[in-house]
Amino acid sequence: MYTFVVRQENSSVYAEVSRLLLATGYWKRLRRDNPRFNLMLGGRNRLPFGRLGHEPGLAQLVNYYRGADKLCRKASLVKLVKTSPELSESCSWFPESYVIHPTNLKTPVAPAQNGIQLPVSNSRTDEREFFLASYNRKKEDGEGNVWIAKSSAGAKGEGILISSEASELLDFIDNQGQVHVIQKYLEHPLLLEPGHRKFDIRSWVLVDHQYNIYLYREGVLRTASEPYHVDNFQDKTCHLTNHCIQKEYSKNYGKYEEGNEMFFEEFNQYLTSALNITLENSILLQIKHIIRSCLMSVEPAISTKHLPYQSFQLLGFDFMVDEELKVWLIEVNGAPACAQKLYAELCQGIVDIAISSVFPPPDTEQVPQQPAAFMKL
């Protein structure tokens, strides 16, 4: 009998995983504060990583990788792309981005070289001067100069401003309470017809305890309800495909797709009929390359191969596609939700790939086969 604890009660994904484990008959759920467990299904914040793996004779597995925030926080992802040797020279799939600290965040900077302590001010990682230089250069060259400011830890479309005015973007950030990223806005996205609408793509990725990378074969397009207009920054519903924004602000929510979601089979049919291309060859090849590049760049920092406990993690990679069919990584979610119709298959894959490979069913010596719903990258 294996045992597990649940320390994240509000995760629909891990609620389903918990249900699947109990249904096997060889997993038992313990009280959340019991230290002698095989598996912890916890929240990604404040996990007790330092206390894991120290129970004598007990293998322990947790559903997050310590340090995965290098990918999953927007500012950290920008820094990773710029500083990682694997990414900095060859990364053409991430929009031009800058980390900006509000001026009201009082963070000491490093001492000057002459030993004089500089006054308390912006963090030393602030990149607003680099942003302004790029902004002014684009303005002089007559290039598209629309940018988007996003809170590093924001979600559900909160803490976002789209503008072509640098001063407006910086003033917006300076009145916030946390770090933001200013990112070049994708002004010419591939649009869906009918409706001339934006979309983004969510792909789910599972990393197991041996750092094998699995891509869930199904993905979902989150679609806008209103026609896209690059110069109308006030209408969030034509720019931001987040479900919360679409559902709350658009009278056309659900008009084109149920729940503003289009799945890969329908998207492939659309690409074939409208553009005479396939999803696999035009878009998925790029998605796979980006996912693998990101995860391999952080492996040395987050792998648990030499630690007394083991980890796995489900990640949500969000992409956009421009009118030239180039795929761009927008962000990585460390605790992704899942489309309702996909829960059963996705969560069964988590059990089979990430959990049963460490704690195999007691009535067989064979490790379960990789579910067909996932592909190993």
UniProtKB/Swiss-Prot annotation:
Cofactors that this protein relies on: Mg(2+); K(+)
* UniProt record, GO biological process: microtubule cytoskeleton organization; positive regulation of mitotic cell cycle; post-translational protein modification; regulation of axon extension; regulation of metaphase plate congression
Give the EC number(s) under which this enzyme is classified: 6.3.2.25
Has keyword Repeat?
Answer: no
Q: Which UniProt keywords apply?
A: ATP-binding, Ligase, Magnesium, Nucleotide-binding, Potassium
Coiled-coil annotation reads none
Q: Which SUPFAM superfamilies match?
A: Glutathione synthetase ATP-binding domain-like (SSF56059)
Q: Give this protein's Gene Ontology molecular function annotations.
A: ATP binding; tubulin-tyrosine ligase activity
Q: What is a single cellular component term in the Gene Ontology annotation?
A: spindle microtubule
**What are the residue boundaries of the TTL domain, all occurrences included?**
3-370
Q: Which domain of life is it from?
A: Eukaryota
Binding partners and assembly:
Monomer.
* Family from the record: Belongs to the tubulin--tyrosine ligase family.
Q: What is this protein called?
A: Tubulin--tyrosine ligase
